[in-house]
Design a protein with these regions (language model features):
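Metal-dependent nuclease catalytic cores that hydrolyze phosphodiester bonds in DNA/RNA
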Residues: 1-129
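Mg2+/Mn2+-dependent nuclease catalytic core
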Residues: 115-178
Length: 178
């Protein structure tokens, strides 16, 4: 059973617009900021295009669609589980439950005191916004948690964007909450 922390920090919901250039969030002051995933996607565009050429457009589209579906399902399973839903896995494909079960022991043994899940964060300094998966204590320390799925293990140098995304969420959270 996970504890959910009542905190004094208000994180406002943001309107979201999907444009041809990517997702944009509108802050309470009316500022429009690109999402962190849109910004990071621009940085990795060349690598993605090279991969598509290597495997072929049809294969790349198939892999991308499968990855997106799997990622969404595992993310929803994690959210349900952290929200202490009794039927957290009902209606999900066995393969997605299997994938979630690889992170379940880490959640059970190291995560608690959940501050927020699926909340928007933005930075007026960086002029970027995004939606963080979870803010909770990991081993007793308040931490940004972003769930990622992959078919294969990845080297650190391949996932620099993950670290940049997490660093952005931490900076935006600090900016909004002090």
């Amino acid at each position: 059973m996970f504890d959910h922390v009542q905190n004094d920090h208000y994180l406002p919901e943001l309107d979201c617009e999907t444009l041809a250039s990517g997702r944009t969030y509108v802050t309470p002051e009316g500022n429009k900021y690109p999402s962190i995933t849109t910004v990071l996607g621009e940085l990795s565009k060349a690598g993605i295009e090279a991969w598509k050429k290597r495997v072929g457009e049809e294969t790349a589209n198939k892999i991308s669609a499968q990855a997106s579906t799997r990622g969404t399902a595992v993310h929803e399973l994690a959210e349900n589980y952290l929200n202490n839903k009794e039927d957290w896995s009902k209606g999900y494909m066995p393969a997605n439950i299997f994938t979630f079960n690889t992170i379940k022991p880490v959640l059970e043994s190291r995560v608690n005191n959940i501050w927020a899940q699926e909340v928007p964060l933005y930075s007026d300094k960086l002029e970027i916004a995004g939606r963080v998966d979870c803010i909770a204590e990991l081993d007793g320390e308040l931490t940004i948690i972003d769930f990622k799925t992959s078919r294969k293990p990845k080297k650190k140098e391949w996932i620099e964007n993950y670290f940049l995304q997490g660093a952005f969420y931490a900076a935006a959270f600090f900016e909004q909450t002090g």
